[in-house]
Amino acid sequence: MGSISHLPAYGHRLLPVLIDEIARDEPDRVLFYTPRNGQPSQGYDEVNTKIFANSINRLCGWLDSQLGSPAGPRTIAYIGQNDLRYFIMMIASTKLGHRLLLSSPRNSVEGHVSLIKQSGCEFWIASSGLDHHEFLQDLQIPSVEAPELPQLLDPTPVKPYVYQKSWNEGKSDVLALLHTSGSTGLPKLVPVYLETAATVDGFHLMEPTNGKRPTGVEWTGTRQLCAMPLFHVAGICLGLYSAVFFNWTVVLPSVGPIMQHVIEDALDHISLDSAFISPSVLQDISKSPRVLEKLSKLKFITSAGGPIPQSVGDLIHPRVPIMQTMGMTEGQWLASVVTHPDEWAYYYFHPRTGVEMRPYSEDLSELVFVQNPKLSATQPVFKTFPELDIWETKDLYSRHPKHPDLWKYEMRRDDLIILSNGEKFNPLAAEGKLISHPWIAAAYLTGRGRFQTAALLYPDENSLDKSDDIITDNVWPTFEEVNKSLPAFAQIHRDFVKIVRTPFPRTPKGTLARNETEKAFTADINAIYDRSTHGKPSVHINGTTEDVVRSGIREAIETVSGLVDLKDDDNIFTRGFDSLHVIRLAGLLSSAFDQPLEVEAGTIYTNPTISQLAHTVWSHLEHGPQDKVHHSEVTREMLAKYAQAFEPPREAKEHIVLTGTTGEIGSYLLDVLCNNDKVAKVWCLNRSADAFQRQVDSAKSKGLSSSWKSKAKFVRYDVASENLGLSQDGLEEIKNEATAIIHNAWEVNFNLPLSSFEPQFIGLKSLVDVCRESRQKIRFFFVSSISAAMNWPSDLLGPVPEASIPRFDAPINGYGSSKLVAEHLLSKAARSGVLSLSILRVGQVAGPVKTLGEGSIWTRRDWVPAIIDASAHLRALPLDLGSASILDWIPIDLLTEVIGQLVVPVNPVVGQENYYNLLNPRTPSWTDSLPGLKARLEASFSDTFEIIPLQEWISRLRGAEKTIVKEVSEGSSETAIRAQSGLKLLAFFEMLASGKEGSRGLEWAKANTLAQSSFLACMEPVSSAWFDTWLKQWGY
């Protein structure tokens, strides 16, 4: 036997030894607060280390009396009220050498029996008030009632039971036998060894990253409510481990199911620093302003067990910081580091966890543990499964659009719904949106193996008495919002919504048990699909004449699709009719006539107009009531007869090469092009190898589509290589198919001389060579810049023309000169007949105002946000912006709409060269926006802001440089950190003030541009509403 004369190092401490050690050395250290008699209103009892260790010894004596002493190692089970007895039972059984099975009270009889058989359980212990189950008698397993908690916590000293094993002798002893949730079948046994628990203690060994330690260590000393089931790994980790390993004080919840009132009771009756609350309970709290207000008293909350719905987090986060935790039964507590408060939905996993994110789909990656001998002390999953080198968690995450080390939990692999057509989608976000409705407590989307998604809704307790129709009517606007975010194949039709009055099965951690829900509600789900196929027809057609049939088919099409104003000869598929509409229309028509008639989907596909379909149906009605409408010879003859007459001439589609899609303009422009029905394909040429993933992440963060309607093809290219570094096949494909090239990629650096841009000209030549060898004349669009002409002498020569710039002194810097040189080179190519040229001179690009994703922001690297950030630190705004005082800015999401209209015009422009000056035609001044800016910033900082001349503002910023640098180094001022960008642009601001950036009266010709872009012609001016949007993006 070993000795306990001293504690081993972190990661090698055995819980039974450690508890006795701290009870001896720190007897008054409070580990837990338990609600007296299980009711917070009666107060809380302190449980210090001495009392806790004594209660374990008392239970050891009781177990010996029940099992016989010495009993020898046995497997025993405990099921009880959600109180401290779980932890006492775990340590006591370990001291005695027994294995303790913790079977969830929510398990079915089948689940309990399965776990008993898997573990070889011989003895069953339950707290009072819990059913001992008849199945125990059938299995001939003796059962007994556990001592009450006050009895165990009696401070009177009892005989000590000393755990005398060394690390090597005790590390393989079982602390508890846990089990999986059984959400995809029967629960599976998962042993937790003392060595497994000690890996959580190994958090102490992990070095700080980004200045933070793993959460368990970082939150040392917190007093936290552990509102989780204590038999579950979440409750054990943040209840037992946190108190013993990390010196937390853990407040235990009241008895009974953990619901909103449990949290409120604790908040009302004990002082707390933080709380550990499941996502399902946070969902309920988000609907209660009263509890939300009480929650705001905490320093932070943490959660685990599933994703917090975005709508729920958005309500809670402004009131109390959310700091998420991640764990799993097989891997215990996964070491993560607290992220920035605004990134509450994301995890930063500590490098010493040894996890990898392996791509699973275009936008999801799976969390995978890879065994590393050097990380043995901090990889618990390989204590659970020592025979494995890799363990796939089946947990899928999405990467942060800007911070590649941050990951957001999205779903389990098993949560994906795969429809009968092979399309698959993630239902969790949609379910989260639905439960944000105040009348809905839970939502479940189904459809695996079916042709259509269906929804089951369980009403909130305050809405249970309302009729199904009233609930559906009230919730339907939320469904319409949900459908906007779902792919077309997954959208939910009103006929596929059912209200249920039985709660959905839940896992112990409170998440939806999807497999059990599917089984429990099989009848309801089948009823939805049966109703859609055999339900009472909502359209009746008497079939007396072909005109009547035609009118009835029109009504049926409107019923299933909402399409109105269809002409008899319109092709329904060009108007948005899809495969789901076809299935529903076939079912509706099959039951709409008085005579028996079966209309197959194929009949609709081969008769895509109202006239064709009506004629086909009418002809078969005429042949007799038993005729079946199918792909018969008659149908083929009818198709041959009408196909040519009704098929509209195909409009040529655009095949576009777009360079630099991962940049700001490129991201929005790709979205615009792919949403244009006249565009068939977009080759996305980028330099980086991971352009596709970056594009997906960027699109998701900006609120843009990341599917691009299957039109986008990502190709890596090298601007300085021959043939752009493309493969021969890739190059030939572009030469054979491309109709247009948009050259958007260009190095942006206003400090470089013209010579530094020479690689750009090499790439430009390669693109022109593609045009020279293409099968058709390419329309070439070059994204230029107004900096190519900012020194244009408009006082002498008038507005900057929509034409080639003949003066080589017009650019303001090397960047502008590079753009001007490119314009002239391309003009030469156009005049030689190689290509048709359009020059797009882009002005000041502002932040987005219509797309509102998390990543849709005006980047702080730009000079306008730099002025705002510096002004926030100075508490002063400049009176003017010098030569930039006229606000002819265009928001980036509107600019790309303009470009899209020019690239894919309604009426193509004739001519070999076209020049467009892309500036807002409506030009308010900076001073017009000052009152709103001043008021917004004063409200944000609760302070007064001055308005001072630009030159004085620059002087103040220069004078504040030392203070800003000092505050940044001390980390004492967020405004100082932001103001740094203004310091870097001081020279630029000086140029604005001196007017060297160009005349204040510089004018730009726009007649041709406005004639070709109605979008630009109707554009709003820069407004206070736009500034409010940008200020919100910047956090003001």
UniProtKB/Swiss-Prot annotation:
Ranges where the record places region Thioester reductase (TR) domain: 658-899
Its EC number(s): 2.3.1.-
Disruption phenotype: Impairs the production of fusaric acid.
Residues with the O-(pantetheine 4'-phosphoryl)serine modification: 579
Single GO MF descriptor: oxidoreductase activity
Matches recorded under PANTHER family: ENZYME, PUTATIVE (JCVI)-RELATED (PTHR43439:SF2), PHENYLACETATE-COENZYME A LIGASE (PTHR43439)
Protein name: Non-canonical non-ribosomal peptide synthetase FUB8
Gene name tied to this protein: FUB8
